């Protein structure tokens, strides 16, 4: 299985923070400086582990890279952004939309995480009964249109 990743490199991330920190507008400068302090203090960490680019769902991480899985499991919160990461979180399966997010995470469910996603693929889990049906009445292609988004939290329990 192949994945297309359009996200940033570590260099891009740090360069962007530096540019924002030096911006002429104070509110940009405020956030850039604050974000830089989060990185410097170890509150935020950007990871470039090899597993991120493997053609595997995150539910395989404990088996394939147990040390990295243990590191994420020990983190107070791991934030995932993007449709591809969401697909890898829920194993890119055609879940019933009301399947719990935790169940869809499979063996990755012990990780405390927040998933931020614009819906661009027809896989989703953790919706309340009737939600998908109601949205489908208004927008039949809502799961792939990029016009809808989703924020989901997993407590790791």
Task: Outline where the language-model segments fall.
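C-terminal functional extensions of proteins
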Residues: 2-157
């Amino acid at each position: 299985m192949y994945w297309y990743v359009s996200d940033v490199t570590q260099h891009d991330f740090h360069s962007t923070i530096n540019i924002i920190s030096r911006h002429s507008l104070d509110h940009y400068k405020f956030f850039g400086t604050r974000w830089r302090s989060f990185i410097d203090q170890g509150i935020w960490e950007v990871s470039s582990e090899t597993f991120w680019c493997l053609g595997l769902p995150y539910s395989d991480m404990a088996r394939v890279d147990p040390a990295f899985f243990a590191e994420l499991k020990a983190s107070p919160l791991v934030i995932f952004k993007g449709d591809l990461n969401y697909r890898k979180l829920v194993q890119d399966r055609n879940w019933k939309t009301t399947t719990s997010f935790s169940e869809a995470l499979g063996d990755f469910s012990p990780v405390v995480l927040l998933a931020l996603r614009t819906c661009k693929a027809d896989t989703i889990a953790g919706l309340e009964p009737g939600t998908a049906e109601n949205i489908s009445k208004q927008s039949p292609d809502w799961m792939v249109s990029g016009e809808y988004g989703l924020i989901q939290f997993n407590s790791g329990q």
